[in-house]
Amino acid sequence: MKLRWLVALGFSILGIGRAETLQPPKAECEMLMNAVLPFAEQMLKKDGEFFPYGGALKSTGKIASIAGYDGRERPPSTDVINLLKQGFVAGAKSGEFKATALVYDVRVVVPSSGKKSDAIAVALNHRSNYSVIVYYPYELKMGVLTYGEVFAQKGESDIFAAK
């Protein structure tokens, strides 16, 4: 599959541009998450779904949106996720990225209730060995998006560890 990158397509519309420098890894990842999450919300409200996509905090402090495309109209989400991860690893190895965010739609068991729910997952990785997946359980009814209890778990540390 050929990897193509679409950079700065959605977030420039949202007015996201430059990150503060010298912040702790968790703070930089939270800032990146806050930058990428609105696009998932927008797509869910508009289309009821979204393809996996991502964002990266560049070493320059700029935030870039990133999408994976292999030429197919509706590739499986796992294929898109793999393309995005390949690009993230390449950016990590080259030193271009200091943090990445992979956003995708999943079904999860909410820890507090034990019930299954749709959720927006945001997998965050930072070059300073910080990795977490944040889950935003949601319910979508008639275009209205309602969040449940947000929770997180340790991430896979699969982007920057691959150096």
Question: Where do the model's predicted regions map?
Answer:
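N-terminal domain-onset segments
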Residues: 5, 20-84
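Bacterial N-terminal signal peptides
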Residues: 7-13
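Phenylalanine-focused residue identity feature
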Residues: 11, 39, 50-51, 69, ...
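Mature extracytoplasmic domains of secretory-pathway proteins
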Residues: 65-109
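Low-complexity intrinsically disordered segments
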Residues: 94-163
